From Swiss-Prot:
Transmembrane residue ranges: 8-28, 32-52, 64-84, 91-111
Membrane topology: Multi-pass membrane protein
Single GO cellular component term: plasma membrane
Family statement: Belongs to the UPF0060 family.
Pfam families from the UniProt entry: UPF0060
InterPro entries assigned to the protein according to its UniProt record, in alphabetical order: UPF0060 (IPR003844)
Protein name per the record: UPF0060 membrane protein XCV3198
Organism of this sequence: Xanthomonas euvesicatoria pv. vesicatoria (strain 85-10)
SUPFAM superfamilies reported for this sequence: Multidrug resistance efflux transporter EmrE
Keywords: Cell inner membrane, Cell membrane, Membrane, Transmembrane, Transmembrane helix
Subcellular location(s) of the protein: Cell inner membrane
Length: 111
């Protein structure tokens, strides 16, 4: 299906925007960061919402499928940003979520 790479890239960009938008307030609230971090937070979360709106599918289907990509992306964040290696159980869970995302987004639909 030709839409798959575009959909997956859009989901990945959406997850990055959401993760950044959630991580910046964490830096402010828990790590002593500046309150000015809330400005890029707002921008990042606005980009997140805009990216979710670009999918041609029904919004509920997009949100459900996006959840699987978000989980996998959050585990990559755990590894790359937090420096914590995901366990095999983390990876198995993410694989199950990504399989669910693929079923939701790429299964045949009747008109």
């Amino acid at each position: 299906m030709t839409i798959a790479p575009t959909t997956l890239l859009l989901f990945a960009a959406t997850a990055l925007a959401e993760l950044v938008g959630c991580y910046l307030p964490y830096l402010w609230l828990r790590k002593g960061g500046s309150m000015w971090l809330l400005l890029p937070t707002a921008l990042s979360l606005a980009v997140f919402v805009w990216l979710l709106s670009l999918h041609p599918e029904a919004s509920g289907r997009v949100y459900a499928a996006y959840g699987g990509v978000y989980i996998a992306s959050a585990l990559l964040w755990l590894w790359w940003v937090d420096g914590v290696t995901p366990t095999r159980w983390d990876l198995l869970g993410a694989a199950c979520c990504l399989l669910g995302m693929a079923v939701i987004m790429f299964s045949p639909r009747s008109a």
